Amino acid sequence: MKSLVLKNPNQDWHPNIWPPFTQIINSKPQLEVTHGKNALIYTKNPKQELIDGISSWWVTLHGHSNDYIADAIYHQAKTLEQVIFADFLHPQAQILSERLSGLTKLERLFFSDNGSTAVEVALKIAYQSWQNQGETRNQIIAFDGAYHGDTFGAMALGERNIFNENFDNLMFPVKRVPWPSTWINDEEVEIKENNAIQILTKLLKKPTVAVILEPLVQGAGGMNMVRPEFIRQVSKVVKNNNSLLIADEVLTGFGRCGSLFAFQKANIIPDLISISKGLTGGFLPMGITLAKETIFQSFISDSPKKTFWHGHSFTANPLGCAAANASLDLLEKDPIKYLSFEEKHLSHIKKIKKLPFVKNIRVTGTIAAFDIEIGKNKGYLNNVGKRIKALSIKKGLFIRPLGNVIYLLPPLCITDKQLEKSYRIIFEILSDL
């Protein structure tokens, strides 16, 4: 294999680290962090205080170094740090399972490690469930613009793009339905929704393993938002055609969309739910797939072939479960933090709306986004996002635009003053473009 020797390697990059989603020859080196607290990140060189405007890839739900969650992990670590979950049960997993089952109305939980595996598990469960019932189904339906993770099954479900095109020949086919993205003052939303439902209904005439979607907001695809009414229509059509609905709540769960789970805004109950990111408050990696009891029962058999042969070394890790229980405590103690966040975004975003190249402003819960129509490329490879990111960091705000999509997704603990400053920085930068 030939190796690429960089002509002018950037010596500021660590010589042993391979950073995610990054081409180092045209990206700025990682900033060294000394510590974080609440909505702030502190860097070493340059010495700087940054507002974490995207919750460190959407995970730090309650901010950095939350004392309550840190204490819960510390006390659990002194009791039990890890145990094989195939043979042993521990209190933190029991408590977490009972709480999440009660909150989602789905009875069974399967633990894994992250968002991609939580989606992968949901897909495997759905596929094998039909097999266990004597049905061979191969069709899977997802939506245009979707991103469900980076393991092979999750990649196959996502939109074919720069993230996964190198592996296209290794991925199974998936049927696609248009995603009726909407925004403030969108006059064509119902037309787009009706078109999508018609296409979905036609596809579902063929026996289908499952339909998977990111309820209300497609994250990495560009913070593409839809109305709760559309999610409700999808659920109805899926149910009427005897298929399964998988809700990928890896991003949208735990208050991010203005309700504890995004599917609740649509007043539906999916057949399977994948959760991660905010699950542990951002402290530890953990994924969970929730399933209805009827699905679980399809695996109960004397036949070994009907067993769900899947597992992870750190399944239901006690430290992760303790962090997740502590995070749920905080959400239950002060739900107004996520219930009222949308109003804060709307009060600040009015000023940005006036700029001529700002388009498609949209807000759902704690997430606010808009498009910058500058340059020919309107997708992830539009360099305007990199320019805005670099300028924002200089001014004290960390954001990571998705190409020409600028968004804010801060921790729930961000102060009104910090949120106002975040919007002010973005407005100042955009005004000078």
Language-model features: where?
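Conserved N-terminal phosphate-binding loop of PLP-dependent enzymes in the Aspartate aminotransferase
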Residues: 1-433
